[in-house]
């Protein structure tokens, strides 16, 4: 069976690019699949599941595309401000965050906004859904890390941090998560909700993606990608990936092979094969694509759904969610209980957003 994926990138020029990458023998070949003038302002963020691609923009809209039918599915209008983060949970839900401080939970069957959280006093900068779909994390410009109980649709916990974090990610198993502040990556353990180690990168971090629970890829404001051991926090490999600074990373798994996809200010997208038995050696370049555009965001779509299959519900039980919510007997200065957090939460159940249904094929 021929291996084939779609590399998707957004850019300052308001365009969504799609490139087909497929394997022929030992070679990976790329070809332009589509270009689409997606927004009226620069594309800021991308998210995919095995059916749809969602794009967010500075024009304050979320555009939905059906990758199987190759048609524009519609627009979601709810936020007031640049869309800063998008993430699908399987085929059922999409979470969006924006400069207006809101996190919206969308049902992907009817594309209704089921819930709206007043998530942060400032902008929402990053969000991440636990593999179980029961918890989510978010960071914003109010110097807080917030935990959301998606089972009951409410705030679970608020942790004050010293500086604004701009990236948060769960590990593949959901047992760890990372919070990125400027040039540092704090590694947290879910069980204790405490920092178990800190990775120090030489440059400000633009992207960080788990390859496995034990290995994370980090890109900063430079041409280099580094792989760090999350247990020892040591750099196990670094290599020059691009001619200009690396903007985005995305990790996929193809038939047991871990692949890091990178995009850069030089307009190139590259695919790197990680040899998990020889992590210290530089990854091999599988293919590269020149877009001649100023790239802003990156993702990959797998027609087979290998990378976007429904996530396991075994990682976090209902009791674990309750344990996360339970206030501590003694509250530290930098922590806030759910009771205090609930005062800032706004929930609008089953509110229908304005939608624009289109059947316009991309050129």
From Swiss-Prot:
GO terms for molecular function: protein kinase inhibitor activity. Residues 347-363 have a biased composition (Basic residues). Pfam families: WD40 (PF00400). Gene3D superfamilies: YVTN repeat-like/Quinoprotein amine dehydrogenase. Residues 322-342 have a biased composition (Basic and acidic residues). GO terms for biological process: maturation of LSU-rRNA from tricistronic rRNA transcript (SSU-rRNA, 5.8S rRNA, LSU-rRNA); negative regulation of signal transduction; ribosomal large subunit biogenesis. GO terms for cellular component: nucleolus. WD repeats lie at residues 38-75, 78-116, 119-158, 200-238, 241-282. SMART domains: WD40. Residues 309-363 are annotated as: Disordered. Signal peptide: none annotated. It is found in: Nucleus, Nucleolus. PANTHER family: P21-ACTIVATED PROTEIN KINASE-INTERACTING PROTEIN 1 (PTHR44675:SF1), PAK1 INTERACTING PROTEIN 1 (PTHR44675). This is p21-activated protein kinase-interacting protein 1-like. The gene is pak1ip1.
